[in-house]
Amino acid sequence: MIDYVGLFIGAYIMGFALFYGIGFFKSIAERIV
């Protein structure tokens, strides 16, 4: 049996972390430039 709730939460957290990481990286890149 697959834990769909855990899988959904994990995917949501990973997607949010990736989106937040990209925005954070862009803000740093803009400060350097």
From Swiss-Prot:
**Functional summary from the UniProt entry:** May initiate with G7P the virion concomitant assembly-budding process, by interacting with the packaging signal of the viral genome. The assembly-budding takes place at the host inner membrane. In turn, G7P and G9P are present at the end of the filamentous virion that emerges first from the bacterial host.
Entry's family note: Belongs to the inovirus G9P protein family.
List the membrane topology term(s). Single-pass membrane protein
Q: Which first-to-last residue range defines the signal peptide?
A: none
Keywords for the protein's UniProt record, in alphabetical order: Host membrane, Membrane, Transmembrane, Transmembrane helix, Virion
Entry keyword Transmembrane helix: yes
Organism, scientific name: Enterobacteria phage I2-2 (Bacteriophage I2-2)
> What is the recorded name of this protein?
Tail virion protein G9P
- Which terms in the GO cellular component ontology are assigned? host cell membrane; membrane; virion component
User: According to its UniProt record, where is this protein mainly located?
Assistant: virion
Which ranges does the record mark as transmembrane? Answer: 5-25
Localisation: Virion; Host membrane
Q: Does the keyword Membrane apply?
A: yes
